[in-house]
């Protein structure tokens, strides 16, 4: 609040099932008032949907959070179609916000999940530090661990599992496609960062030098060798891949 001694706190709230809303909380009267809520057309009723937080064990023992949302009745004890989203870079948090475009998928029985992999800051600064530079591969192993956990829990199966990532999340999709193509039916990499080595070796590209802090400087052999282990473009091989949209 801009007024320090105000008795009213104004805040916003959203979740995977709750459209963004602005609230005023009266600290003296202990009352809550909705000031504004984003309109959702089509008769949306959030009581028809459920959201959960799960945790998947990573290979090194870290517990990776997963946010999921689905329409009630979608989990019937048999694997469902599931779309798994991931990013995991720059310390950015993949917030479980309300996304209107997901309603159509949920209404058709699709489960939507966000893998809060290392490289983001969902669990604090250390979560970011453990997903960059020489620890970047944690981002990919975390995502694979989340996918495996969702399959093990019976929420989905490899023939019904799709994955999506954008930009640096597209790097995640490309790396995971090379590492575990058998785990997914389809993968979407939107504006993906897939040619890591050549991009980071070209200082004429505006963002290259400042991004050494995120990926490392491939002009140094240790970084070059490590980046080569996951750069999607450099690890494509003769194997059966999921259906890909790039």
Language-model segments: which ranges?
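Short strand->helix junction
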Residues: 73, 91-92, 120, 133
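A fold-wide structural signal in alpha/beta-hydrolase
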Residues: 82, 106-116
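Conserved hydrophobic/aromatic pocket- or pore-lining residues that grip, position, or stack substrates
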Residues: 22, 56, 66, 84, ...
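Serine-hydrolase catalytic-loop signature spanning alpha/beta hydrolases and amidase-signature enzymes
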Residues: 88-92, 112
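Non-catalytic accessory segments flanking enzyme active sites
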Residues: 1-78, 92, 97-103, 107-108, ...
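Active-site-proximal cap/loop segments of hydrolase catalytic domains
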Residues: 114-246
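Short beta-strand segments enriched for Tyr within beta-sheet-rich domains
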Residues: 80, 110, 183-185
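Glycine-rich His-Gly loop
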Residues: 14, 85-89, 167-170
